[in-house]
From Swiss-Prot:
Cofactor(s) in the UniProt record: Mg(2+); Zn(2+)
One GO biological process term: DNA-templated transcription
Catalytic activity: RNA(n) + a ribonucleoside 5'-triphosphate = RNA(n+1) + diphosphate
Coiled-coil spans in chain: none
Function: DNA-dependent RNA polymerase catalyzes the transcription of DNA into RNA using the four ribonucleoside triphosphates as substrates.
Name recorded for this polypeptide: DNA-directed RNA polymerase subunit beta'
Quaternary structure annotation from Swiss-Prot or TrEMBL: The RNAP catalytic core consists of 2 alpha, 1 beta, 1 beta' and 1 omega subunit. When a sigma factor is associated with the core the holoenzyme is formed, which can initiate transcription.
Keywords from the UniProt entry: DNA-directed RNA polymerase, Magnesium, Metal-binding, Nucleotidyltransferase, Transcription, Transferase, Zinc
Upper lineage: Bacteria, Pseudomonadati, Pseudomonadota, Gammaproteobacteria, Oceanospirillales
Pfam families reported in the protein's UniProt record: RNA_pol_Rpb1_1 (PF04997), RNA_pol_Rpb1_2 (PF00623), RNA_pol_Rpb1_3 (PF04983), RNA_pol_Rpb1_4 (PF05000), RNA_pol_Rpb1_5 (PF04998)
């Protein structure tokens, strides 16, 4: 019998579903949901508190107020279940049906649904091909619309004002029909013949040529097709029946004092019902048209307000002038249903408290206050107490726990043994913000946290709080232990380096004992082993810093597992021996025989993890921490004012600087330098002085001179506390010490400009009032910045997570050969990121050949490059590797494990089911708070330093050129190509330096030459842009007429004459169409042809160019024909930090972006139009020219007759990512975005693996634009999901049909999130109304593929351990296309049978 009850219960709720579909509800469906019509606006009788009949809370419609009890009290209790009381009409059942039973209101006149009217683009407008204004005028009864033109001159859908309507009535009588209001719109929608309309539209799309028209038509066509395919009828966008929300979801609560607290929805419903009833009455009375019309308009407005208040006109406000919260407001925004209740829920079995440090804990433990544990583990304690027979009932057990008897504590200790708890610190910016620990019961009320996990939580002990959560089920405990335990999260998922490295005190302690001191007690002693050292230390026979010799036995293991043992005598100190004692076997002694700075310790831990694995590393990290804390305490390091040693040279330096400044002031006074130059020079002087003082100060702090054993002076590392803290990396930096003991330096004004008088004193000397005041700007700005930064960074993370949330590893290998070409990142003379770091943990896409022997395969395709492989690549001198990447992965939904490569947090190939999208988003978003918010103004030193005019080699090696076209000249090679690079390779052929070569640079070395460090290999003039002759001969001027197209100028100093071209606006009208040109002729006076082409050598000179030649002069190859002065380019602000990252991921078009060549070919200039230059590119083999208009003020880098490659820069500026994708393809785009994002993070010293950024880029490239339809079902110009297009192409290939043509689109992360296939995911992100409207109209189905959708519907997510569950369900679904679930009839039959048998 009990089972049957459960069966009945479960029949009501559908739990097994595979998709969710959203569509328009037809009136009949709304009526079928409803349990009765709400006819009265009354809610509750204020005296009896009982709901009014037929009102908004009517018990007959919505169900009883008390469980199993009708309203009048005739039927009570369970035995009358299901009876309908004949007196009050209430069904006897559970009161919770008031949460699920709906009612309805029959509207006296149809009403348009505001979402489909006002949510842009207006769906009703698109369907009827009318503008929103026109439809609104019809709906709100301002004009008539013709619904049936009959045999008249009027057209269907034409608007008529009152006068026009009466005129038409007089003219045509009853021939035509025109109406107003929603009825008219409904009728027009009803009469649409979708099939016919679609046919007409498709023909129009084919025939149209204008782009705007095509856009409009395809929008309409798409909507029509959506209606046709989804089974929605257009007239359902106009409501005739309004559903009423169940009353318990819009409660009315009596407060004391006879007042009621009510949900706003009740007010809105009351309005609708009042107006509806009034309208019914007016219609019954057949009131005058104008009154009825007004009432209908008011009804329309009240329904609008109920659905989405404030969307049209002024929002309806309540008694307190606050707009009422409508149905739409309930679901959107941070406080709406999606984000407040579905994506984030509060959790049971949790608590929070302040955290304090727990230096005695092991890495996997946390201290949990007994009081908290008792509360959190209550059910487990009750069960144990009952099981032991200590309590007879749960109630008794509860009493015992409240009394806190001794047995309870014993049982608590048993219960929590090996039961992990999860600790979380808000804000949880990455997955390491929640980790599992085994609780250790402690007295007190604060949670104890292990110091080494603070970095992962970003926690400190200045009052931070943390939350504790208890995993209840066995599975949850298992996952917490296997996946979330702090000992399993040693590496950071962002970059694969240890995140549990020691910091602060621990670093200081370890650094202190690893230092050595001259002439310390026991110097020069020799010890047999480290144990002997320890004894000597204990007996105070030797100082911890003494330089001694010790016999060391080490066992070294390498990455491949080979073990090597050796014993030797090492020069070391007792302190380092102490450290060596806790180092696990397998690591070499040289790793600890050095000053243990933070970097060295981190490296030690990393090596330990890679060679010895997790367990050893955890034990070692704990030991390091205990040792570090102990030794830091014993060292007695502290800070005193005396430690801030001010260098003696400071005051002389400041005097010298002031002298220089005085000189510049005098020059300014006598007019030799401009105001701007003076300012820049002064700022430069002070910046330089500051650096010099800082240098002197650090030198002063770094070393101290002491007497050695022989009584001579010897330098040793200083034991100054402040210096030690900074040097070890424990706390502080050179910049901070500079402010304490050097000079504070230059300060900025609130607007960001630098104040030219610096603060010359430091904190030890103290600041005077003016200096203090100047300092306050920066301090305030810093605080305001931090607050803004946190919000911005959080929003960026949210957008990233949203765009990448459905990206999960779902295949082992997709089998593609595509990939990205990885090269070392070289900027100027420095290798910023060597190849080994870039390819570590990636899979090789194609065989890598050995550079020393081209036939030998060095690494086979499909190899996962680990540390061993990477080292081999480096020794072979491999310079570039094609590796698999998430961007080029061919998996349809998700990515494959091979393209992703190594799971950074685990160090092996990524598992299937790993949510790599979310990990990528967190890795990029989490350091967001460390980025700066400001945009850098270029000023002072920066703007002048940028005028580089030569290349000086740093290290030396072999010269290589890249894309360099050059001609031979007497001074050397002259570069005549745009994007040339000069690289220097080392003896293994690996590039170590790389420099840009501008057009016109003179290079003094050849390809393959050996150069040495410090050699200058190229020079150029940074202030002019030359035009270089590529042939030799005689010069002939064309169209150069004095005063018309050119002016002669003579330089007073040198006496040389230059010819200056006049720009077209400065010429007299005679010269408007003339084009100054220099041709090169041979000795016979014939034009010379350019090498390798059939084009004559002629150089057109733009306005402003200066030419120093005379007509008829001889020129040689590589000579300068003319120079174009570069106006110092407008100083652009460099956007840095967080805003830059956001711009890149949002794929925003930069202002004044660089102009790229759209085709490969030859450049010429066509006819100029007003203010614009016409650039023409003629491809070599075809004659379809490409033309583009470019504003005159843009400086062009190309000359007439020059060849450009597709995608080459024609005019400088910031690059536009959309152009890169269109002209150079995905891999070039990926390289650009990855490098730009990395540059921002690198400046802040944040390491993020490239693959995270690539993962996000993959999601930004999800959409394609259809260029040609082929025989597919797409529409020309529509944006479709890339995976869908590939599926369609597979289908068409199989059927041997014409394939569609498409081009990849780059969408910004916000756009991409909203354009996802899943409407649940998009609606819970932003613009909920728009997303839901669109989804409903198109009858969208959500396949519940991503993580977000599954969280919203309350399922396990299809990632991690939930992935298996989803795969299993998918398999079952495929099997179970067979028998159906039992119908209601079968259930009833079974029920009656069971009842009859139990009745016997």
């Amino acid at each position: 019998m009990k089972d049957l009850l459960n069966l009945l219960k479960s029949q009501g709720q559908v739990t097994e579903f595979d998709k969710i579909r959203i569509a328009l509800a037809p009136p009949d469906l709304i009526r079928s949901w409803s349990f009765g019509e709400v006819k009265k606006p009354e809610t509750i009788n204020y005296r009896t508190f009982k709901p009014e009949r037929d009102g908004l809370f009517c018990a007959r419609i919505f169900g009883p107020i008390k469980d199993y009890e009708c309203l009048c009290g005739k039927y009570k209790r369970l035995k009358h279940r299901g009876v309908i009381c004949e007196k009050c009409g209430v069904e006897v059942t559970l009161s919770k049906v008031r949460r699920e039973r709906m009612g309805h209101i029959e509207l006296a006149s149809p009403t348009a649904h505001i979402w489909f009217l006002k949510s842009l683009p207006s769906r009703i407008g698109l369907m009827l091909d009318m503008t929103l204004r026109d439809i609104e005028r019809v709906l709100y009864f301002e004009s008539f619309v013709v619904t049936e033109p009959g045999m008249t001159t009027l057209e269907r859908g034409q608007l008529l004002t009152d006068e026009e309507y009466f005129d038409a009535m007089e003219e045509f009588g009853d021939e035509f029909e025109a109406k107003m209001g929603a009825e008219a719109v409904q009728q027009l929608l009803m009469e649409l013949d979708l099939v016919e309309e679609i046919k007409i539209l498709r023909e129009e799309v084919e025939s149209t040529n204008s782009d705007t028209k095509l856009k409009k038509l395809s929008k309409r066509l798409k909507l029509m097709e959506a209606f046709k395919d989804s089974g929605n009828a257009p007239e359902w966008m106009v409501l005739t029946v309004l559903p009423v929300l169940p009353p318990d979801l819009r409660p009315l609560v009596p407060l004391d004092g006879g007042r009621f607290a009510t949900s706003d929805l009740n007010d809105l419903y009351r309005r609708v019902i009042n107006r509806n009833n009034r309208l019914k009455r007016l219609l019954d009375l057949s009131a005058p048209d104008i009154i009825v019309r007004n009432e209908k308009r008011m009804l329309q407005e009240s329904v609008d307000a109920l659905l989405d208040n404030g969307r049209r006109g002024r929002a309806i406000t309540g008694s307190n002038k606050r707009p009422l919260k409508s149905l739409a407001d309930m679901i959107k925004g941070k406080q709406g249903r999606f984000r407040q209740n579905l994506l984030g829920k509060r959790v049971d079995y949790s608590g929070r408290s302040v955290i304090v440090v727990g230096p005695t804990l092991k890495l996997h433990e946390c201290g949990l206050p007994k009081k908290m544990a008792l509360e959190l583990f209550k059910p487990f304690i009750f069960a144990k107490l009952e099981g032991r027979g200590l309590a007879t009932t749960i109630k008794a057990a509860k009493k015992m726990v409240e009394r806190e008897t001794a047995e309870v504590w014993d049982i608590l200790a048993e219960v929590i043994r090996e039961h992990p708890v999860m600790l979380n610190r808000a804000p949880t910016l990455h997955r390491l913000g929640i980790q599992a620990f085994e609780p250790v019961l402690i007295e007190g009320k604060a949670i104890q946290l292990h110091p080494l996990v603070c970095a992962a939580f970003n926690a400190d002990f200045d009052g931070d709080q943390m939350a504790v959560h208890v995993p209840l089920t066995l599975e949850a405990q298992l996952e917490a232990r296997a996946l979330m335990m702090s000992t399993n999260n040693i590496l950071s998922p962002a970059n694969g380096e240890p995140i549990i490295g020691p910091t602060q005190d621990v670093v200081l302690g370890l650094y202190y004992i690893s230092r050595d001191r001259v002439n310390a007690q026991g110097e020069g002693h020799v010890f047999a082993d480290t144990k002997e050292v320890m004894r000597a230390l204990g007996n105070k026979q030797v100082h911890i810093h003494a330089r001694v010799k010790v016999r060391v036995h080490e066992v070294v293991k390498d990455l491949e597992g080979n073990v090597e043992e050796r014993t030797f005598i090492a020069d070391t100190t007792p302190g380092r021996c102490k450290l060596w004692d806790i180092v696990p076997a397998g690591l070499g002694f040289d790793m600890v025989n050095q000053n243990m700075t933070k970097k060295a310790i981190s490296k030690l831990l990393n090596t330990c993890y890679r060679i010895l694995g997790t367990k050893e590393t955890c034990i070692f990290a704990d030991q390091l921490m205990y040792l570090g804390f102990r030794e830091a305490t014993l060292s007695g390091s502290s800070i005193g004012v005396e430690d801030m040693v001010i260098p003696d040279a400071k005051y002389t330096m400041i005097d010298a600087a002031e002298e220089e400044v005085r000189e510049i002031e005098e020059q300014f006074a006598s007019g030799l330098v401009t105001r701007g130059e003076r300012y820049n020079k002064v700022v430069d002087i002070w910046a330089r002085t500051n650096d010099q003082i800082a240098k002197a100060m650090m030198e002063n702090l770094r070393v101290e001179v002491v007497k050695n054993r022989d009584g001579k002076d010897e330098e040793q590392g200083s034991f100054n506390s402040i210096f030690m803290m900074a040097d070890s990396g424990a706390r502080g930096s050179a910049a901070q010490i500079r402010q304490l003991a050097g000079m504070r330096g230059l300060m900025a004004k609130p607007d960001g400009s630098i104040i030219e008088t610096p603060i010359t004193s430091n904190f030890r000397e103290g600041l005077n009032v003016l200096q203090y005041f100047i300092s306050t700007h920066g301090a305030r700005k810093g605080l305001a910045d931090t607050a803004l930064k946190t919000a911005n960074s959080g929003y960026l993370t949210r957008r990233l997570v949203d765009v990448a949330q459905d990206l999960v590893v779902n295949h082992i290998d997709c089998g593609t050969e595509e990939g990205l070409l990885m090269t070392p990142l070289i900027e100027g003379g420095d290798v910023v990121e060597p190849l080994r770091e870039r390819v570590l943990g990636r899979v090789v896409a194609r065989d890598v050949m050995n550079p020393l022997n081209q036939d030998e395969v060095a690494v086979e395709a499909g190899t996962l490059l680990d540390e061993v492989w990477v080292a081999q690549l480096e020794t072979m001198g491999v310079d570039e590797v094609l590796v698999r990447s998430p961007i080029t992965c061919a998996t349809r939904w998700g990515v494959c494990a091979t393209c992703y490569g190594r799971d950074l947090a685990r160090g092996h190939q990524v598992n299937v089911g790993e949510a790599v999208g979310v990990i990528a988003a967190q890795s990029i978003g989490e350091p967001g708070t460390q980025l700066t918010m400001r945009t850098f103004h270029i000023g002072g030193a920066a703007s002048r330093a940028s005028a580089v005019s030569s290349i000086q080699i740093k290290h030396g090696g072999k010269v290589r050129f890249h894309n360099a076209k050059h001609v031979q000249h007497k001074d050397g090679l002259v570069i005549v190509s745009r994007s040339a690079d000069l690289a220097v390779a080392d003896e293994l052929g690996r590039e170590r330096e790389r420099y840009k070569l501008p057009y016109g640079a003179t290079v003094t070395v050849n390809e393959g030459d050996e150069v040495s460090g410090g050699q200058v290999v190229a020079t150029w003039d940074p202030h002019t842009h030359p035009i270089i002759a590529e042939v030799e001969g005689k010069v002939q001027f064309g169209d150069m007429e004095e005063g018309i197209t050119v002016n002669h100028q003579t330089d007073e100093l040198t006496g040389l004459t230059n010819i200056e071209m006049l720009s077209s606006q400065n010429r007299p009208s005679a010269g408007k169409d003339m084009r100054p040109v220099i041709r090169v002729l041979d000795s016979k006076g014939k034009p010379i042809v350019m090498p390798n082409t059939d084009m004559p050598a002629q150089y057109f000179l733009p306005g402003g160019a200066l030419c120093g030649l005379k007509d008829g002069a001889n020129i040689g190859v590589g000579d300068v024909i003319a120079r174009i002065p570069q106006e110092s380019s407008k100083t652009r602000d460099i956007t840095g930090g967080l805003p830059r990252v956001a711009d890149l991921f949002e794929a925003r078009n930069p202002k004044e972006a660089a102009i790229l060549a759209e085709k490969t070919g030859t450049v010429s200039f066509g006819k100029e139009t007003k203010g614009k230059v016409r650039l023409v590119i003629t491809p070599d083999n075809s004659d379809d020219n490409y033309e583009e208009l470019i504003p005159k003020w843009r400086q062009l880098n190309v000359f007439e007759g020059e060849r450009v490659e597709k995608g080459e820069v024609v005019s400088d500026g910031p690059l536009n990512p959309h152009d890169i994708l269109r002209l150079k393809g995905e891999s070039e785009l990926a390289r650009y975005i990855v490098n730009e994002v990395q540059e921002v993070y690198r400046l802040q010293g944040v390491k993020i693996n490239d693959k995270h950024i690539e993962t996000i880029i993959r999601q930004m490239l999800r959409k394609v634009e259809i260029l040609e339809v082929g025989e597919s079902h797409f529409i020309k110009g529509e944006q479709a999901e890339y995976a869908r297009v590939m599926e369609e192409i597979d289908r068409l290939k199989a059927e041997d049909k014409m394939l569609p043509q498409y081009q990849r689109l780059l969408l910004g992360i916000t756009k991409a999130s909203l354009a996802t296939e899943s409407f649940i995911s998009a609606a819970s992100f932003q613009e909920t109304t728009r997303v839901l409207t669109e989804a409903a109209v198109t009858g969208k189905e959500d396949d519940l593929r991503g993580l977000k959708e599954n969280v919203v519907v309350g399922r396990l997510i299809p990632a991690g351990t939930g992935y298996a569950y989803h795969m299993e369900r998918r398999r079952q679904r495929a099997d179970a296309r067979g028998p159906e679930a039992p119908t209601m009839d079968e259930v009833e039959a079974a029920l009656s049978e069971a009842l009859s048998s139990s009745g016997e």
